[in-house]
Amino acid sequence: MWTLEDFVRESNRIEGIGEPTSAEIEAHRRFLAIPGISVADLEAFTATVQPLAVLRRHVSLNVCVGTHFPPPGGPGIELRLETLLEDATPESASAYATHLSYETLHPFTDGNGRSGRVLWLWMMGSAPLGFLHEFYYQTLRAQQGWG
């Protein structure tokens, strides 16, 4: 069974980041204990794991991720994130679909992968075999119509 520390280590490894700090592990622990996620909760989490990153709520905060061009920065980013989070409940939404929408929106200037994965884990409740294992099978189910 994977521990939270294993999850954080895997999440960092996906980004090419070294071993997690105690502050990063604690930020994950705090986030997972929140009953309902808000934009402010994601901002607080991201400030710990990527201190210079900010929410792209200002018009000039545009980013490019490889060949993906997320929506331009501005007030619409925060509004879209609020809408995404309103729908992001473990009971009513797919963690897989929410994660894809979050990464497509790319609401922060940096740290979106790790903040997106902690949101995914919050929705899942647990990932006994880790993010990559669970997300791999979620992707297969989504693409091939598996139950």
Give residue spans per PLM region.
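FIC/Doc superfamily catalytic core
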Residues: 1-147
